[in-house]
Design a protein with these regions (language model features):
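Nucleotide-activated chemistry modules centered on ATP-dependent adenylation/adenylyltransferase
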Residues: 2-245
Length: 245
């Protein structure tokens, strides 16, 4: 009879074997493999951020049936909403939009501007506006496999991530995790993908308007959440038993 420890060990071995296979493939091959292996239980996410067009183009070309989830926090830049509309029209798809259960106006009226309340406030804001909607998306779409466009070059906290990993009950994979900024730029140029409007305004990363500021590539991690942290919470274990992430 398998113990809980045996089960966890088996999961780690499965992920290790999957990573070994994924390492031998390019980004397109990784997406095709995952789409076939986990058909019917896989989703992808997009933030419609600065480099989102890359993953969206790869998905449209190599796995167009994978649902694309967009978490609308209610606090994105106006330019991001317009860019989202442009990319969906250009690439010919419609994202599945998930929003918080509470409106931005109600949240602020009852709890204030939580993102100004230090790490605890930012974490609670992320749980309500990002983690809960994403968890709901996974549950409603029947998915336990999640594709994301994270890259090691984006931050020190992402530099050691593998192509695939377990996050709570969800298997996550990052098909372009090993792409550097130059490769991203070449791909966008070669495929004539439109750039986010704020890329020319000095932004090197993109999130909510209240917690993202312009900056240089060398200071990318200080441009989010007043430099107190980089991850919004979606790519960290929620630590809650009723969450998939």
């Amino acid at each position: 009879m398998k113990t809980e420890m045996d089960a966890k060990s088996g999961i780690k071995e499965d992920v290790a074997a999957l990573n070994e296979h994924l390492h031998s493939l390019d980004a397109a091959g990784r997406i095709e493999l995952l789409a076939e292996k986990f058909s019917g239980r896989i989703v992808a996410t997009t933030s419609f951020g600065l480099q989102a067009a890359v993953m969206l183009k790869l998905l449209r070309d190599h796995a167009p049936r994978i649902p694309v989830v967009f978490i609308d926090t209610g606090y994105l830049f106006a330019e991001t909403y317009r860019y989202a509309a442009l990319l969906q029209e250009e690439l010919g798809f419609e994202a599945r939009v998930y929003s918080p259960l509470v409106t931005a106006a109600r949240q602020e009226a009852l709890h204030g501007r939580e993102w100004e309340g230090g790490t605890d406030g930012m974490n609670n804001y992320a749980r309500i506006h990002k983690v809960e909607p994403m968890n709901r998306a996974l549950q409603e779409l029947g998915a336990d496999v999640w594709l994301s466009g994270l890259r090691r070059a984006q931050s020190s906290g992402r530099s050691q991530r593998e192509i695939a990993e377990k996050q709570a009950r969800t298997l996550k994979s990052y098909p372009i995790i090993d792409w550097d900024d130059g490769k991203v730029e070449r791909f966008m140029r070669d495929h004539r993908l439109p750039c986010h409007p704020l890329a020319s305004a000095g932004y090197v990363t993109m999130g909510d308007w209240h917690s993202t500021s312009p900056g240089s590539e060398s200071s990318r991690e200080s441009t989010r959440f007043n430099g107190e942290k980089y991850e919004c919470g979606l790519h960290l274990n929620s630590g809650q038993q009723d969450f998939q992430i």
